[in-house]
Amino acid sequence: MRAVLETADIAIVALYFILVMCIGFFAMWKSNRSTVSGYFLAGRSMTWVAIGASLFVSNIGSEHFIGLAGSGAASGFAVGAWEFNALLLLQLLGWVFIPIYIRSGVYTMPEYLSKRFGGHRIQVYFAALSLILYIFTKLSVDLYSGALFIQESMGWNLYVSVILLIGMTALLTVTGGLVAVIYTDTLQALLMIVGALTLMVISMMEIGGFEEVKRRYMLASPNVTSILLTYNLSNTNSCNVHPKKDALKMLRNPTDEDVPWPGFILGQTPASVWYWCADQVIVQRVLAAKNIAHAKGSTLMAGFLKLLPMFIIVVPGMISRILFADDIACINPEHCMQVCGSRAGCSNIAYPRLVMKLVPVGLRGLMMAVMIAALMSDLDSIFNSASTIFTLDVYKLIRKSASSRELMIVGRIFVAFMVVISIAWVPIIVEMQGGQMYLYIQEVADYLTPPVAALFLLAIFWKRCNEQGAFYGGMAGFILVVVRLTLAFAYRAPECDQPDNRPVFIKDIHYMYVATALFWITGLITVIVSLLTPPPTKEQIRTTTFWSKKSLVVKESCSPKDEPYKMQEKSILRCSENSEVINHVIPNGKSEDSIKGLQPEDVNLLVTCREEGNPVASLGHSEAETPVDAYSNGQAALMGEKERKKEAEDGSRYWKFIDWFCGFKSKSLSKRSLRDLMEEEAVCLQMLEEPPQVKVILNIGLFGVCSLGIFMFVYFSL
C-alpha cells in the first residue's frame, strides 16, 4: 500500500523548495554571472567546504539511493567498491590533474585536449561524447531513479513531478550559474547526509546492529511457498532467491559476475579515472576554487564523505532485503512484475520500501526532500556542465567572434533545450523502468569511457604523445566500443528462469574485462602512432603536462610588430583604436625594467591587438577569439562595443530586469572593468602557490584519506 503525504511531510518538502530557491536568488544577487568565468566557474571564488560538498552531492544522486541500495540488496557489499575507489581517485584529481588544468587556463575538458594536442577534432569528439553521456545516460538514470522513488513512496503523478523538478532545476541553473549550483549543493549535502544517517540509525535499531545485518542478510531468502499461494502465479519456477555466498566480500574472485577483482582494478578503475579526473561535472567544481589549496582541500573533504555511502545507502539496502525479502528478492519474472512492475527484478525498490515502512510521518517528508535534493543536484550539475561544454567547445568553433554576452545567452538557451530533451525522454524511461536499465547504462558508461581515460593519462604523463596518436587511438577505441555495444544490445541477457544461449564472448566475458581491453588497446595504438609521427610542439606541452614547469609571469603585447611588453601578474593592458598602449598598469610599484630579462617561453598570458583595436586574449597561446580590451585572472572582460552602454542606459525597465535576471551587465561595463579586474584574484598561475604550512596539512590529510580508503578495501574484501 502506498503512503499518503501527511501535512507535516508536505510542509517539510515545501520548506525545502523555498530554501533552495532563496539560495539560488541570493546567488543571482551577489555573484558575478556576466562573464564566462563568473557564470561557468563561479568567478574562481569558492572555498573548499562548498566545493567538497558539491563534489559529493554531484556524484551521490537519486540513482545512488536507488541503485546502490538495490545492488546492496541483490549482491551485498560489492557495489561499495566504487565508493572507496572514488575516495582514492579524488586525490589523484586534486594533486595531479587540477594543477595542470589551472596552469593551462582552461574552462572545459575538451578545451584542455585542444590546448594539449592542437587542432579541434579531438576537442569536438570529446565534447560530443560528453554531451551524449550527459543527456542519454546520466540524465535518464536520474529521471528513472527519481520517478521510481516518487511513484513508490508518494504516489505522485509521474509526469507532473518530473517536469516540476526539471523545471525548477533548470531555473536555478539558468539564473545563478555555477555559484547557485555549488551553494545549493552545500545545502543538499547537509540534507542528504542527515536524512540518510537518520534512516540508517532507524534501520540498524530495527535489525540489532552491523554484525546482525551481516548474519541475517545471508539468511534473507523469500518464502517461495507463501508467495506461490499468495500471488497465484502460473509460473512456479524460482531463481536467484538465495543471497550469494560471497555477498559479504567486496572484491571477489576473477570469474565473479559482479566485481571480479582483476577487472575492477585494471578495467573499472580507468573508467573511473575519466569520471573523477576528466569529467566536466566534477572538474568544473574544483576549477571554481580560490586557489590550489582550496582545490586540494575540497577533494580531501569529498574523499572523507565518500566513506559514508557504504553505510548510509548500501547497508540500508541490505537491511531492506532482510525485512522485506518476499518483495525485494522476487522469485521469478511473473512475481517481480506483480510486485514492482518490472520483470527484471525488484531490488531497485529496496530504499523506497525501507523509507515508507520504517520512517514515521514528518521524517518521511525529510527523506522525500533528500531524494529531491539528490535528483536536483544531479540535474543542475548536468545542465550547467553540459551547457559549458556546448558553449565553449562547440558554439565558439562555429561563432569564433562571439561576444561574452552572446556566450552567456547561448549557454542558457542550451539549458532550456536540455529541459525539452529531458521531458521528452520521460515516456521512454517509463517504458524501460526496471533493474535492467540501470545496469545497462552502467555497462554502457564502462564501454565508452576507458579510451578517453587512456588519452587523458597519456596526455598528462607522456610528453611525446601527439595529436595524431591521440586521434587515431581514440577512434580505434571508439570503433571497438560501437562493435561491443551493438553486440551487447543484439544479444540481450535472458530472464533468470530462461536458458542463456548467447555467444560465449558475450555471455562469459565480464564488461570490466572488456573495459580493460579497450583501455590498453587505445593506449597502445596511441603510443605507436605518436612514435611514428612528429612530436608535439614545445608550446603544446609547455603548460599542459605533469612535467611542465610553473610559469611565473605574464606577457602582454599590443602590437604584432613591436617587442612584447613584459608585465607583472595582475597587470592590465588597454589599447586604443590604432593599436597603441593607452593604459599600462603594473601594481606594487614594479617597473618594466625589473622583468625584461625573462624569456618568452616563461610567459603564459598573451594579449594582442587586431587592426580594429580589439585585443585578442590568449592564455597559453590559445586564442579566445573574443574582443576585449582588458584581461586579468584568466577572465576576459568584453569592451569592444564601446558605444553599447548608451543602449543599455536607454533601455526600458523590462529589459534592465531581464539583463539582471540572466546576469548580463552591459551597463557601465567599460567604466568598472579596470577597477574590478585589479581587485580580482591573481592570474591562474598565482593560484598554484601554496603556503608551506598549508601544504604540510594537506599532505597529512592526503595520507590519512588514502590510508582509510585502502583499509576499507582490505577490510571488506577479506
Curated annotation (Swiss-Prot):
GO terms for biological process: inositol metabolic process; myo-inositol transport. It comes from the Eukaryota. The record marks G24, R285 as: Implicated in sodium coupling. One of its GO terms (molecular function) is D-glucose:sodium symporter activity. Keywords: Cell membrane, Glycoprotein, Ion transport, Membrane, Phosphoprotein, Sodium, Sodium transport, Symport, Transmembrane, Transmembrane helix, Transport. The chain crosses the membrane at residues 10-29, 39-57, 87-110, 124-144, 158-183, 187-205, 304-324, 354-376, 407-430, 444-462, 511-532, 696-716. GO terms for cellular component: apical plasma membrane; basolateral plasma membrane; plasma membrane. It is found in: Apical cell membrane; Basolateral cell membrane. Glycans are attached at N232. Coiled coil: none annotated. Residues 1-9, 58-86, 145-157, 206-303, 377-406, 463-510, 717-718 are extracellular. It is a multi-pass membrane protein. The keyword Iron-sulfur does not apply. Residues 30-38, 111-123, 184-186, 325-353, 431-443, 533-695 are cytoplasmic. Interacts with KCNQ2 (via the pore module). Interacts with KCNQ1; this interaction is direct. Forms coregulatory complexes with ion channels KCNQ2-KCNQ3 and KCNQ1-KCNE2. NCBIfam families: sss (TIGR00813). PANTHER family: SODIUM_MYO-INOSITOL COTRANSPORTER, SOLUTE CARRIER FAMILY 5. This is Sodium/myo-inositol cotransporter. It comes from Bos taurus. The gene is SLC5A3.
